């Protein structure tokens, strides 16, 4: 039997279960900044459930805690400090200016 007629077989990979990102003793609260900061991107956005590997209930509680921390000014709404930094100076024209009337 040639290769084109053989049934397709998937190669078996070893499956290693990852540890849950939130332990049973962790309390999801707006004051627990070490826990909350793990679920926020560099821009300050809330990461999705698929990225966080959380259950629906955990993701909902994390989202509420992050929003409460933002309202109480414990977290910024946006994290774009790089927006106001200038890396290069922009050359400006220093010659005489003429107006068109």
UniProtKB/Swiss-Prot annotation:
Q: Please list the GO terms describing molecular function.
A: small ribosomal subunit rRNA binding; structural constituent of ribosome
Q: Which PROSITE patterns match?
A: RIBOSOMAL_S18
Signal peptide start and end residues: none
Keywords recorded for this protein, A-Z? Chloroplast, Plastid, Ribonucleoprotein, Ribosomal protein, RNA-binding, rRNA-binding
Entry superkingdom: Eukaryota
Query: Could you tell me where the Basic residues compositional bias lies?
Result: 1-19
- Mention one GO biological process in which this protein takes part, according to its record: translation
Q: State the residue spans of region: Disordered.
A: 1-23
Give the similarity note: Belongs to the bacterial ribosomal protein bS18 family.
Q: What is this protein's record name? A: Small ribosomal subunit protein bS18c
Q: Which organism is it from?
A: Lemna minor (Common duckweed)
């Amino acid at each position: 039997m040639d290769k084109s007629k053989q049934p397709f077989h998937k190669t078996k990979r070893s499956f290693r279960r990852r540890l849950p990102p939130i332990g049973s003793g962790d309390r999801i609260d707006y004051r627990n900044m070490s826990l909350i900061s793990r679920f926020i991107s560099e821009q300050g956005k809330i990461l999705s459930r698929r990225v966080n590997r959380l259950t629906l209930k955990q993701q909902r509680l994390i989202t509420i805690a992050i929003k409460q921390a933002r309202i109480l000014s414990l977290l910024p709404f946006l994290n774009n400090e790089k927006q106001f930094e200038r890396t290069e100076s922009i050359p400006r024209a220093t010659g005489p200016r003429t107006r068109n009337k």
